[in-house]
């Protein structure tokens, strides 16, 4: 399973102002056409700060087409310094 496009998540403005960093572990399912058919947060630190933006970003990801749907996990990191 090879990514074609994995746009970075948007940084929540309130977290950026506060200098908050964190990580979100997302489970995602890639459909046969390479689009994301399902996604959910498995773990987030800090809780509920970056969840929405992580899921919004993952929904825009695209992979090369696959023979059968594939479920995988990815960690998205948020760091106000870049």
Feature annotation, model-predicted:
Residues 13-14, 43-49:
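A short acidic/small-residue loop/turn micro-motif
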């Amino acid at each position: 399973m090879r990514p074609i496009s994995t746009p970075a998540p948007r940084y929540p403005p309130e977290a950026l102002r506060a200098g908050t960093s964190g990580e979100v572990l997302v489970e995602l399912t890639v459909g046969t056409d390479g689009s994301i058919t399902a996604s959910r947060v498995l773990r987030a630190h800090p809780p509920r700060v970056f969840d929405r933006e992580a899921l919004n970003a993952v929904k825009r990801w695209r992979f090369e087409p696959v023979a059968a749907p594939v479920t995988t996990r990815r960690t998205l990191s948020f760091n106000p310094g870049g």
